[in-house]
Amino acid sequence: MKKITLLLLILLLGNIVHSQEIYFLTGKNYTNYKIHYKGTGTVNALDKKGEGDSYEMGIAIPIKVQRLAFDNNLNYTVGLTLNQYNAESGDLANNYTWKSEYIGLQNALVYSFVKSNLLDLAVKGGVNVSTLLYGNQTINNSRFNLSNQKDFNGLIVSPLFGLQAKCNLSEYGYLSLGYNYSRSINLTNDSDKKLSFLTNQIVFGISFELY
């Protein structure tokens, strides 16, 4: 896992040199665990919801499209992400807690439909590819490692859609507020039990233009 993390950092930092904007995002994930078994419908005997932290650092590369009314209102972003997908549940007899942390690479296209010197409003669509960095489940006072659970580990792909508002902080700096919705798919889970993370994400960010 350390080798994967180091490789992602090298690739990301290597591209920053040639980019025009670098960004840092942090926020909250509000996640709902959806579980179903092969050949059946969704099975969630208990609501499994929770919140966790989200972090992303990356680069934004302008894409010039001649048919668009303004220059550089389409951007390609690539970033290294760290997301927590947590949940809690329980009944009269038992308490359940899941804590999981995933490291990944996120690619997205961001289109600014309102763009001025002071304000930038944009829609966003992309995909996050991640793998489990850490995870455990607690049932009452007993804790279990999730790293060997097929519904949690492996290759997780999460298509996402969102909105972003950005305003000028200085001549080359910006503050941003964003909302993203994603639903995960585990590409390597061949068991009968399937788990998806349905996540509403709120993020705050800062970005700087590089020349």
Regions found by a protein language model. Name each.
Residues M1-I4, S19-Q20:
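Positively charged n-region of N-terminal signal peptides that target proteins for export
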Residues I4-L13:
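Sec-dependent N-terminal signal peptides
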